[in-house]
Amino acid sequence: MTTYGKLIGASLGPGDPELITRRAWAVLQSGARWLYPVKKAEESSYALSIVERGGLPIPGDAEELVFPMTRDADILAKAWQRAAVRTVALLAEGRDLVFLVEG
């Protein structure tokens, strides 16, 4: 039987790294693998930049998930499906994941 890791959401506040909660800061340093959103593959992530400006090093295994900025339902559905499949695959490895989100 597979033992899944936990998926943890880390809200990073409105963009000022000084406003990241203590709990989110602790989760970011817990050893959980980081997932972060981008609009396009290999593009910068606003959520990731908040953490960087806060002074935390970005783990080498941090991974982007692409969430395109479009109203095309087919494109969105495919992107969300890819992100979900990847997230479940990583959780199935048994390691906790933290998903970085602004707001």
Question: Where do the PLM segments sit?
Answer:
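Class I S-adenosyl-L-methionine
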Residues: M1-P17, R22-G103
